[in-house]
Amino acid sequence: VLVKCGIKDGMTLGFHHHFREGDYIVNMVMEEVHKMGIKDITICASSLGKAHDPIVPYIEDGTITNIQSSGVRGKIGEAISAGKLKGLAIMRSHGGRVRAIESGETRIDIAFIGTPTCDDYGNCRGIGGKSDCGVLSYAMVDGDYADKVVAITDCLVPFPNFPAHISMTCLLYTSPSPRDTE
């Protein structure tokens, strides 16, 4: 999916945090970005917590050089405080993130939306499946404004997945998560 989306150095990748400390989307995507040798990535995430500690080596090696978020906790916060992030750490409220994206101040090249359920056409819902989280409100702005949008799910459901929190008209690709087979 990263190749199909045209991933390259210097891009901004969008993520949300509906799964809280159970999120593995950021780690999974950034591991692949790192393996591809891509550098100078800006992560624009609604929040980053202890679940994302595995991306610290990518901060240290320059894979990730900027972070925009509502907050950072755990080892990411420690790495930023220790001066390991080569670029900027911009902290905004959730609404401030939405405003920055809607106004064009922040441009997301590729958004990765972890969704509890999704059909083959990309209709995403935060309800159902193994990872039920409610609505996908933090990710709606990513779906509407990112240049390319990828839905990642551990539960593909029959079309139509309705009512969709994020419509298939926003999506470019859907991708079953490795956890889809668990």
PLM features: residue spans?
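N-terminal active-site beta-alpha-beta segment that forms phosphate/nucleotide-binding
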Residues: 1-78
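A generic local secondary-structure boundary/capping motif
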Residues: 4, 96-105, 114-115, 134-143, ...
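An acidic, phosphate/nucleotide-engaging active-site surface
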Residues: 64-126
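Structural signature of FAD isoalloxazine-binding scaffolds in flavoprotein oxidoreductases
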Residues: 138-155, 171-172
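His/Asp/Glu-rich metal-coordinating catalytic cores
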Residues: 156-172
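Conserved small/polar residues in nucleotide/adenosyl-binding loops
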Residues: 173-180
